[in-house]
Amino acid sequence: MSLYEKLIAKEAVLAVVGLGYVGMPIAVAFAKKGLNVIGFDTNSKKIEAYRSGADPTKEVGDEQVRNTTVQFTDEEQQLRKADFIVVAVPTPVNFDHTPDLTPVIGASEIVGRNLKKGAIVVYESTVYPGCTENVCIPILEKGSGMVCGTDFKIGYSPERINPGDKAHRLENIRKIVSGMDEESLEEIQHIYDIVIEVGTYPVSDRKSVV
């Protein structure tokens, strides 16, 4: 049984790391399709708001937050249950216009020390070419004690959500998906196709994921 099939059958868990304007809509969209979803954020006040039915991002709306089945948590150990992890933390820009990778590095450290063998980690955060391979993968390997490509897989799907845009939503924007090999690409594409109504655009060139 593929990971996609396990997620559909609720025999696997999907987690979203970073519940801001990108991560929150992703978590709610997958939960709406019946998947077991963990929504993780280090900001305890944000988690409290979501649990109370409030949406500080304004991207989903209070009603959907109240009705969602997403399991909101600030306890990183909950990520050990996850078979498919979406990293959707922000990548702000420094004063010299270089990307501030602090949130991505922090998220990778958290995921790494709680990574389940066989899991797929997909980065949605906007990063420069080579960042996934040179920065993220070593952190994941160090934290987990596992080897990328053997014990877990990596993918990349750049976020395309424009905050406040009510017309162009996650579901109706075609999404680029890539994986480190054909197997991971196929899984990632099938899983994102669950929520992307207009379909995904698979990129098989390995350089696109690193």
Task: Give the ranges of each region predicted by the language model.
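Conserved N-terminal Rossmann-fold NAD(P) cofactor-binding segment
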Residues: 2-13, 32, 36-38, 42-84, ...
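Alpha-helix C-terminal capping/helix-to-coil transition sites in glycosyltransferase folds
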Residues: 80-81, 117, 172
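Redox-cofactor binding/interface segments in oxidoreductases and associated redox assembly factors
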Residues: 85-87, 123, 178
